[in-house]
Amino acid sequence: MKLHEYEAKELFSKYGVKIPPGRVATTPEEVRKIAEEIGGPVVLKAQVVVAGRGKAGGIKVAKTPEEAYELATKMFGMNIKGLVVKKIYVTKYVEVEREMYLSLIIDRATRRYLFLASPIGGVDIEEIAKTQPEKIKRVYVDPSVGLRDYHVRSIVLWLGFKPETPQWRQASSIVQAMYNIMVDYDAELVESNPLAVTREGDVIPLDARVIVDDNALYKHPELEKALEEDPRDVSEFEMYAKKIGFHYVELDGDVGIIGNGAGLTMATMDLVYHFGGRPANFLDIGGGASRDVVKEALKVLLRHPRVKVIFMNIFGGITRADEVAAGVEAALAEEGGTKKKIVVRMKGTNEELGRQMLAKLGIPLYENAEEAAQKAVELARA
């Protein structure tokens, strides 16, 4: 789950980090009111969970409440990388002396947390890595040991702060807060870009990003509720799949994919790519899928406007072919049939019974996965 900037900054504030005054608005009138309350110049930030908002016109500075109102009327409804602007974060404009970069991620290769710090901020860390890799410091933290003072000192020194000054203490507290957020909220990313030193001498995060592991959302009901109220970059189909309990990822192709097991599903996607097609999704119904799970999974793709063909690749170990066929039958019955072509390759437990059930629906069963994938791609092109 990707948090909006205002949500991420609320977390930072909760952990004692100073942030500029600001609130989120859903109408131009609210934007004007917040700007009046803040006083002076304000920054309007479109709340969409994608990078590059500024280049797309999603970040503007307003000197007066009226200017903020006018800018907001244009900003609401903007499409930024496929996401529509429905919220604007209005925050006090801050003059800065310098900008830095600081993030915390999970390094899966070493199974440790990894801080990335650079005295250069406000630009993509990937760009810094390409042009000035020597400017990036990597500090690994073993989760079994936790964050220690020597970790913090190493990071803060690299960012250019003098020991035991007020700025040193502020920067140190930000490092500690980011680590605590990472651990407490099961995050995959905690980032401030830029982390800034203001004209007043404060160290504050001008921007903040937090991504929480979707598999840990059950531990954070307030975030689950926020995601339900505002799906952000999660499609309606992904939200539905999450509620039903199977794994679904939205892609940009037109061949719908259903498999049982992550490995088989990814291999099925590879086959579609191999024959020149483009998968519309990743959908894993898991092992031992019941009739109802298959039914709900198929309904997602039957309703998806971009899906032209549905390719089901099922290996029946603990998953029974007749249960899968029954799920297909139930989905078509509930949806009143479909004009979309369904291609099925199914092997294993109760395979013959499943074949007979699908034959009654006019759906042929393919023996070979390559042949089935090729047929699915051909039908999508037709």
From Swiss-Prot:
Q: Which residues bind substrate?
A: N260, G317, I318, T319
Looking at the keywords, is ATP-binding present? yes
Q: So where does ATP get bound?
A: K45, G52, R53, G54, V94, E99
Keywords of this protein's UniProt record, alphabetized? ATP-binding, Ligase, Magnesium, Metal-binding, Nucleotide-binding, Tricarboxylic acid cycle
Q: Which cofactor does it need?
A: Mg(2+)
Q: In which pathway does it act?
A: Carbohydrate metabolism; tricarboxylic acid cycle; succinate from succinyl-CoA (ligase route): step 1/1
Binding-site positions, Mg(2+) = N193, D207
How the cofactor is bound: the record states: Binds 1 Mg(2+) ion per subunit.
Q: Which GO terms describe its biological process?
A: succinyl-CoA metabolic process; tricarboxylic acid cycle
Ranges that cross the membrane? none
Q: How does it assemble?
A: Heterotetramer of two alpha and two beta subunits.
- What protein name is recorded for this chain? Succinate--CoA ligase [ADP-forming] subunit beta
Q: Which gene encodes it?
A: sucC
